[in-house]
Amino acid sequence: MLLIAMASGVAAYLIYHSIPALAPAGPYLDKAVKVLQPVLMFMMLFLSFCKIAPRQMRPHRWQAWLLLIQTAGFVIPGILLTLGGRGHGSLLAESFMICMICPTATAAAVITGKLGGDMPGIITYTILINIVTAIIVPAIVPLVHPAAGISFTTAFCMIMAKTFPLLIMPCVCAWLVRFLLPDFHRWILHFNDLALYLWSVSLPLAIVVTTRSIVKSDIPVSYMIGMAAVSLICCIIQFWIGRRIGAKYGSSVTAGQALGQKNTVFAIWMAYTFMTPVTSIAGGFYSLWHNIFNSWQLYRQGHPHHHSD
């Protein structure tokens, strides 16, 4: 089902792009996607928070390791770029930085829950990594990619405004429902897979955004292939490292999703806003890789007789 959702997203944009008569609808479709995506994300997180009691939101040791890895993956290449100057590999280095620091996807809680992981753990990490990103990115970006008028405070506020409304408001609403409307809360809990179905609707929209960023790019094919390779390597490494670290604390699935499943819409926005705009393609390719991997994981979860643990 999820692979079909991804394919439909690619096909939808390519059909639109190939039919000139549809061009006037572009601005309206763009506005619709920009409204629908946050609404779907809000609903997915709201449903996830409804399943979690406030006391379950607590830090774990594996989260500290993952925060360190993401921070190092952004800061170290940033320092090397600053000291070594910009060359032919600078776009690939920026692509690596974006793929490493990008926060956990809001939909990660849905996939983690479906895979039998710890939903409170990954939601806690999602909040923590968004805070870290809002601090680290404004501190390093001016060194790597100076831009007039963007100070630490400005960049910090821009990132917080981009990410936190979709994290905090679903949490507040879910917990208000839990304590003030317990009957409604119990009714919501009957819909176990609703968040997954919402993600299946949200996924084609994300793939449309990804496909558009790739199709509209005018960079040489060699750079595009390089960014695709960098994003694939980052995806594989982060899922693998996350699972390895998580396994030591009994949270293999949760840590793997926390480090590997990214908010690629944010990655694309961050590339356009703070880095070289063409590096947004790396975020687009990462969206393909992690969604393919998630589809495979969910398939294995639903067909346990096809593999052995």
Predicted features and spans:
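Alpha-helical transmembrane segments of multi-pass small-molecule/ion transporters
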Residues: 1-309
